[in-house]
């Protein structure tokens, strides 16, 4: 049985990107073809030469909300709030960071004005009702702070409000960016279109659970967080058309892979709207995509396990070793990989 420790690798802390490069598509791109082909060190801006006319790139069009708030308990203790998802205009599922857990009926006095009341709790998440001056989503857009990942050791600034969004973000609801999409700027998209590459979109609202570590030793015992997603009929038709013309379906990010795999029914992609808790790790056969663009992921994370299921665990760990040796930049604001699938029987 696979263990969490099977997905460990050593990463020097200085390789964790603390901010974006000045140009989105200037990030490096490691090409990881199917074995035994060698890794190639490229740049994201090289993608038009690496892809083929008729290929379909599938993006996640979710938009990050400024979901971080601060306040204090009535007793005076400080509270940090991270909105996980909206439930109507004035309620939300929230993660709280505080010295002591809160109980139903407790109030939080918000620094930005108004207050929130605890209605219930489910594990690490609280259900809060917000008494604020406008609908919660609108209010957050004015007063909320962008929730940068915990491994970025600085406060967010105005530049992050632009750069921690994809240029095609339109469906509001994520608390973390689909980071593979951050590398695509308008110039690169125009060059890909000119190459004959088509674009399609899914929506998956990335939740705060994406940063939660695996806390069990055996992978089979891990329970994934739930996230809302949508695969529309238009995208399903685009995938079918790409397959019919011999084009490849290329996922931009693990959220796209999780969405497409969750929408597979009897071996066929179908339109779907709902929740997914899919956990993809080696032993699972990914059938919905032919390649994927993805960033470098944390050691022992579910995202690293997903890419290992696609490209092979040994192959991925070898690629990560190469990336460390070549001083690639890691995680959300870091560099990317273009992955192709493992060979049959490859571990």
From Swiss-Prot:
Pfam families xrefs: Queuosine_synth
Region forming the signal peptide: none
Keyword S-adenosyl-L-methionine listed: yes
GO molecular function, one term: S-adenosylmethionine:tRNA ribosyltransferase-isomerase activity
SUPFAM superfamilies: QueA-like (SSF111337)
Gene Ontology biological process terms, A to Z: queuosine biosynthetic process; tRNA wobble guanine modification
Subcellular location: Cytoplasm
Alphabetic keyword roster: Cytoplasm, Queuosine biosynthesis, S-adenosyl-L-methionine, Transferase
Alphabetical list of InterPro entries matching this protein: QueA, QueA_dom1, QueA_dom2, QueA_sf
Pathway: tRNA modification; tRNA-queuosine biosynthesis
Major enzyme class: transferase
Reaction catalysed by this enzyme: 7-aminomethyl-7-carbaguanosine(34) in tRNA + S-adenosyl-L-methionine = epoxyqueuosine(34) in tRNA + adenine + L-methionine + 2 H(+)
This protein's record includes keyword S-adenosyl-L-methionine: yes
Cellular component terms (Gene Ontology): cytoplasm
Function, as annotated: Transfers and isomerizes the ribose moiety from AdoMet to the 7-aminomethyl group of 7-deazaguanine (preQ1-tRNA) to give epoxyqueuosine (oQ-tRNA).
Family listed: Belongs to the QueA family.
Protein name in the entry: S-adenosylmethionine:tRNA ribosyltransferase-isomerase
């Amino acid at each position: 049985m696979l263990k969490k420790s099977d997905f460990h690798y050593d990463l020097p802390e200085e390789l964790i990107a603390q901010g974006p490069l000045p140009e989105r598509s200037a990030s490096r791109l490691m090409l990881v073809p199917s074995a035994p082909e060698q890794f190639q060190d490229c740049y994201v801006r090289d993608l038009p030469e690496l892809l083929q006319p008729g290929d379909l790139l599938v993006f996640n069009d979710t938009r990050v909300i400024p979901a971080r708030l601060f306040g204090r308990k009535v007793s005076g203790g400080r509270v940090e709030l991270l909105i996980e998802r909206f439930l109507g205009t004035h309620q939300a599922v929230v993660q709280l960071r505080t010295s002591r857990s809160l109980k139903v009926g407790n109030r939080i006095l918000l620094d930005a004005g108004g207050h929130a009341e605890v209605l219930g709790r489910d594990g690490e998440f609280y259900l809060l009702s917000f008494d604020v001056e406008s609908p919660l989503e609108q209010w957050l857009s004015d007063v909320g702070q962008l929730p940068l990942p915990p491994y970025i050791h600085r406060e967010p600034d105005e530049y992050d409000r632009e750069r921690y969004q994809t240029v095609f973000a339109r469906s509001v609801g994520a608390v973390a960016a689909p980071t593979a999409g951050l590398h695509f700027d308008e110039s690169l998209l125009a060059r890909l279109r000119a190459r004959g590459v088509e674009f399609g979109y899914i929506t998956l609202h990335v939740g705060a659970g994406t940063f939660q570590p695996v806390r069990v030793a055996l992978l089979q015992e891990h329970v994934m967080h739930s996230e809302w997603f949508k695969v529309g009929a238009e995208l399903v038709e685009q995938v079918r058309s790409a397959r019919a013309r011999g084009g490849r379906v290329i996922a931009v990010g693990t959220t796209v892979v999780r969405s497409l795999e969750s929408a597979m029914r009897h071996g066929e992609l179908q339109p779907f709207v709902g929740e997914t808790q899919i956990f993809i790790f080696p032993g699972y056969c990914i059938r919905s995509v032919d390649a994927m663009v993805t960033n470098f992921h944390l050691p022992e994370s579910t995202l690293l396990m997903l890419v290992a299921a696609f490209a092979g665990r040994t192959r991925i760990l070898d690629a990560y070793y190469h990336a460390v040796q070549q001083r690639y930049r890691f995680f959300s604001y870091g560099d990317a990989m273009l992955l192709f699938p493992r060979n049959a029987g490859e571990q």
